[in-house]
């Protein structure tokens, strides 16, 4: 039975299940989902919301699931709809009902929000490293290529500025108005490497401006990369013949 299906009289159609399921593309969030859950379980134990032994059992179970996923031994299913329910279902199957306590003081709303931000923090860092490596190489064709150095440097600045708004913790906001449990959001922020906590729960779980801003930064960067690649194509043409592109990076 689906998490939300308590009042329904019959199972949803397979076509609806397939349409609603996001596991095909949010499976990539498994590391962030497990990291967020480990931090949340640690906080629940620390605050005495669940027994420390229960928290330890949940954390051990999550770490084992992470290892199995990376070893290719876990198969996600559409029946569980998304990465969050897949992992929680596997955890409960392995360690019993204590696994259900992981969701204490947490909603899927703030859970997916923290996963999304953790993932984009990682991706922003990877893009920055790539752009840094690219700008480091643009030093031999003098003034012309230095124009690209300036473009890519501004791209890095945009990603760095975008990261300031990504790097804020939504976990602890619950569905939209927090929780009555005595959670420690500052502890969670420190555990997950966020620089600050989002103060408004409704904003934290419902808004995706940070994702749109991230895509905007990617679009501007791709515009600059497109311009650079177009020049390489032009320079390699018969009319110019400035450069020769290696066969390994060419097509017929």
Residue ranges and their predicted role:
Residues 116, 123, 140-252:
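Charged, flexible cofactor/metal-binding loops and thiol motifs
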